[in-house]
Amino acid sequence: MAQDEQVLVVERKALEQAGMFQGLAFDVERYFSRIFVPGVPRYMSRPQAEADPAYKQLIPYVIMTCDGKVLSYVRGRRAGETRLVGLRSIGIGGHINPADDMPLFSADSREAYLAAVEREVAEEVSVEASHTNRVVALLNDDSTEVGSVHLGIVHLWALDSANVGKREQMITQMAFMSLPELREVRDTMETWSQLCLDGLAEMTR
């Protein structure tokens, strides 16, 4: 990672005020009303954020579905997060940087966040399909080193066609897979994807 990279974070105590959880939380508005208010989101150097569990880096985690199948891929050697290399994932997304021009101290921070997610996804994959975009859950996993300093915001994109191509070299073996196929390879997935796979029925209601 670049030593001067700035990433979007919130203090852990903002989550604690809304109710700390382990795994998935489906009451999105309860947490968004604490996170996306002026003065709460801020930028911090990524090396500092990676070492300080008092802060959570906000990570959009976009799950794409089409005709009952879910987009999946394996994180290759060029993955930015080396601790996840070689693991299967069903989430597209990454850190939000200041270049995303998100107004942190205005009432529009939530809308700006959603626009930043679209840009982040476009850096990793090309989506030549119309889609819906719903925030369906928040994801917290304090049981791992990676998870303790990140908070996932799980988006569900329902695509009207499977026309998705990769842009990032770290994305390998990309394909739409059925739920039975994904369950067969669950043990090869990163923890966040395992949690999302287990909660997919709730997310798609």
Question: Locations of the language-model features?
Answer:
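N-terminal leader/linker segments that precede catalytic domains of diphosphate-processing enzymes
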Residues: 1-171, 177-205
